[in-house]
């Protein structure tokens, strides 16, 4: 059995824009439903959702039959948590709250086997298809895509250094936490925050490093795309359900 190809990583390297959704429910059914909708990637958020490795595994299995990449965000830049997600078969991870180049290097080490990294070796996991993939340990990193999240003023000031760490495949700018760090909590589209985000994407574009963002503000999203953002999440499942439910109820008020 061959190592699964990471369409998302290949698309980023080819300069192709990737449009995605945020998945927050511990529901493989919802994940599979979303996988039928034509998006390029779906991210399971374990940072701000009551989900763990078991639910992440169910998510990865649910989306696997479809032409969509399952991305997982661990709760923290934690080598043990990252190891579990990789062993479950995740090939693309978004690491939250990366503040410095050293923290980016720690994330790289966590997804890499020794001697270059610290990922623990286990031969019988879903990632190896329970031993069916030959030479998995030697080839795993060819298809692992590591995205790091910059979401504070201090981290944004170091975005070029963080993005330049060998092994980082993309940098995601988080508008919500960034706005809070600028003193505008709950205002991710504030002009000062927006200007900082667009400046960050311009720097990433100059370096040739893919940039990403999540927002429901189409004005911010389009400006980010024009500035160079390449992997763009345009909605959150919980928000879509709530918005549709409220709109339908209003029609029958």
Curated annotation (Swiss-Prot):
The answer, when asked if Lyase is one of the entry's keywords, is yes
Q: Which reaction is catalysed here?
A: D-glyceraldehyde + pyruvate = 2-dehydro-3-deoxy-L-galactonate
Per the record, what is one GO cellular component? Answer: cytoplasm
Please list the residues that make up the active site. 48 (proton acceptor)
Site Transition state stabilizer: give positions: 73
Q: Which GO terms describe its molecular function?
A: aldehyde-lyase activity; metal ion binding
Entry cofactors: a divalent metal cation
Keywords from UniProt, A to Z, are: Lyase, Metal-binding, Pyruvate
Name the positions where a divalent metal cation binds.
151, 177
Pfam families tied to this protein: HpcH_HpaI (PF03328)
Keyword Glycosyltransferase in record: no
Q: Where is this site: Increases basicity of active site His?
A: 87
Q: What is its EC number?
A: 4.1.2.-
Q: Which family does the UniProt entry place this protein in?
A: Belongs to the HpcH/HpaI aldolase family.
Q: Which PANTHER family match?
A: 2-KETO-3-DEOXY-L-RHAMNONATE ALDOLASE, PHOSPHOENOLPYRUVATE CARBOXYLASE FAMILY PROTEIN
The record's function comment reads: Aldolase which can catalyze in vitro the aldolisation reaction between hydroxypyruvate (HPA) or pyruvate (PA) and D-glyceraldehyde (D-GA). The condensation of pyruvate and D-glyceraldehyde produces 2-dehydro-3-deoxy-L-galactonate. Has weak activity with hydroxypyruvate and D-glyceraldehyde.
Name of the protein this chain belongs to: Hydroxypyruvate/pyruvate aldolase
